[in-house]
Amino acid sequence: MNPVTKLYIKVFFQAGIPFGLVMSAIDLINGNGFSWEKFLFSFIGFGLFMSLALVSIHIHRLKKLGVQKFTDENLSVRQTKIVTSPLNLSEMKQKLKSDLALEKMKMTEAQNGILLDSKVTWKSWGEKIGVILQCKDGGNYVYHISSKPRLTRTIIDFGKNLVNVNNIEQAITPHS
């Protein structure tokens, strides 16, 4: 199945079912009883609306970020990338601390890398980012960059974690 179609279906169910259940619970609390018709209308209507709106905006933003072929990986809110850099561990840490896109994030030094926590913004509830040294390959260092939402149930991030990974990659790799 097409990854975009899978995402539409995933959002449809994960938004529609809870909304339908909450609306049914409200009816039960108000003494109106349970109605399958009302549950299905709430579930399908809200699920369809949220799926069409959120996934379409997500796809549009990813296209703006340069994604041309959609896969399960680049549609995911958990982004990872392996990057080769001439910077050693201490140089990489210094470079990230001085980068404008990352300087507002809380940085914690790990044994083989650095962990960053972004704050809550109007775009997200924050992200957890890791840049971990995997190995040394000749004169270069191989880093594993990962970015994921702080809120684990997030299903759409509008490309925020992809931007985080790309910003770190640009900061620690030489520009041609």
Question: Where in this protein do the model-derived segments appear?
Answer:
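Ser/Thr-rich, low-complexity intrinsically disordered terminal regions
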Residues: 36, 55-176
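N-terminal alpha-helical membrane-insertion module
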Residues: 1-63
